């Protein structure tokens, strides 16, 4: 348990636990094989996305669906594809904001342009609900805002679409890639590359990280580095190593299992 706490409060997830996920893990060898093949075109990727959407809609045959909408590329793309495939489908767009002057104003305009209903959930004090949300996910997490749009979506439909995972699947963290490459040197070993990677996720830990734990948790950075070694101790290119770490890290151990726990709790 103490190791779980150490890892979660440093990486935002604990890669030592077993998770059940519909999203498969990837190994460096799989990426290497793909890189030696033919890259899919944007049209092929679009076709695959439409196929996934159609499969989900056909399986559930909903009268209405919910969509978690922000002003980001991922959820906007999802909305555009859904409306293009189903021009008459009743779509409820849901945004979560922590003040009335947030991005919800722009998200509403996007929703209206696609002829959908828009709902904004304003969370006045996110810290107030944190103990309750942590009791659901059973982990010391702070990034649990998705509960609010999942809860709201339950009022409209049992089928919810989100843009979660778009950055990990399609390389959306460009600001982090730029920083990683600026720190990267061809002679860096796996440990130095791991350090660079963590420096690009500085919002997940604090500069004096080793001081926030008591004596019961023997914190040292070497233990954290070893958890990520598999992603950087291989012959992939530097950005492919970052993609592998992002995909197998936050997507597999953070976004997917956290959302699944909320889905199960709320019956989505």
Task: Walk through the language-model features, giving the residues of each.
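Short hydrophobic-aromatic micro-motifs
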Residues: 2, 12, 160-162, 251-252, ...
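Short, intrinsically disordered, charge-balanced linker/junction segments flanking boundaries
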Residues: 121, 245-247, 251-268
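N-terminal glutamine amidotransferase
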Residues: 1-36, 40, 51-57, 146-147
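ATP-dependent adenylate-handling active sites, centered on carboxylate activation for C-N bond formation
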Residues: 35-242
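Short alpha-helical scaffolding segments that buttress acidic/His motifs in well-ordered protein cores
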Residues: 8, 133-134, 265-266
